[in-house]
UniProtKB/Swiss-Prot annotation:
This is Elongation factor Ts. SUPFAM superfamilies: Elongation factor Ts (EF-Ts), dimerisation domain, UBA-like. It comes from Acidovorax sp. (strain JS42). Keywords: Cytoplasm, Elongation factor, Protein biosynthesis. Signal peptide: none annotated. Coiled coil: none annotated. The gene is tsf. Residues 80-83 are annotated as: Involved in Mg(2+) ion dislocation from EF-Tu.
């Protein structure tokens, strides 16, 4: 059996960024063969990734990349907010956004097969993801992305949890302000005419319920419903919203854009974890389960 030295462990860690104890175990199993130990670690880290794959990822980051008229927005998820602040995780997200912009992958699976090496976990982005799962011990996933091309682009990231890309013609400063506005006010459409019919139907149903409870005559109730729907449309359409930086507190986004001779052709808003049902842990139940498992294994 070959002697496993501290320098060998350090060398393997430098190549794989795996935990020190995992490196020592791999070297011991490989009888000091560095190449074999490195391969053993890759397999082991991949196994850890498989075990973590079923765990919910509702935290994470939104990353963007823009180069001229080509850009991308991507959401990358983790299990905890702690991991979303990890430098390697953030680097992976930024790299993924760049790969989307440069290669236009068809879907998440195709994105994962693109070449990219980070922390010695390459050669593909999927290898990097699995390597980080093995290193950190948390599941992580590429949730969604969008690629943009052919238009002027402005991006805004609020921290790392909210990301916006605006497609526009005109003034770049005005477009950047709109991106910031979208992050703050979260409109669902450019104009009231673009608001999805299902959202309008839901709002109308709520308004009708309130009108029915009011006991007002039918004609007045109908006006109440229509008024509520119109108010909702103004609140959720970008053009009709009051611009967040309006000096008078009244100027709408549409008015601001007209003054800046700028047209917004579209926008995309990503909010980390939006629509993902988070797992709520019952700590007492978890402890009880662990105690029961320990007793059964004794």
């Amino acid at each position: 059996m070959a002697a496993i030295t501290a320098s060998m462990v350090a060398e393997l860690r430098g190549k794989t960024d795996a935990p020190m104890m995992e490196c020592k175990k791999a070297l011991t199993e490989a009888d000091g063969d560095m190449a074999k130990a490195e391969e053993l670690l890759r397999v082991k880290l991949g196994t850890k990734a498989g075990k973590a794959a079923s765990r919910v990822t509702a935290e994470g980051v939104v990353a963007s990349f823009i180069n001229g008229n080509v850009g991308a927005l991507i959401e990358v998820n983790s299990e905890t907010d702690f991991v979303s602040k990890n430098d390697s995780f953030i680097a992976m997200a930024n790299a993924a956004a760049k790969l989307v912009a440069e290669h236009n992958p068809a879907d998440i699976e195709a994105l994962g097969q693109l070449a990219y090496e980070q922390d010695g976990f390459g050669p593909t982005l999927e290898d990097v993801r699995k390597g980080l799962i093995g290193k950190i011990g948390e599941n992580m996933s590429f949730r969604r992305f969008k690629r943009f091309s052919g238009s002027n682009l402005a991006a805004y990231l609020h921290g790392s949890r909210i990301g916006v890309v605006v497609e526009f013609d005109g003034d770049a400063v005005a477009a950047k302000d709109v991106a910031m506005h979208v992050a703050a006010m979260k409109p669902v459409a450019l104009t009231s005419a673009d608001v999805p019919a299902d959202l309008i139907a839901k709002e109308r149903a709520v308004a009708e319920g309130k009108a029915a409870e009011s006991g007002k005559p039918a004609d007045i109730a109908a006006k109440m419903v229509e008024g509520s729907v119109q108010k909702y449309l103004k609140e959720v359409s970008l053009a009709d919203q009051v611009f967040v930086k309006a000096a008078d507190g009244k100027q709408t986004v549409a008015q601001m854009l007209k003054a800046a001779n700028t047209t917004v052709k579209g926008f995309t808003l990503y909010v980390v974890g939006e629509g993902i049902e988070k797992k709520v842990d019952d700590f007492a139940a978890e402890v009880a389960a662990q105690v029961a498992a320990a007793k059964s294994g004794a």
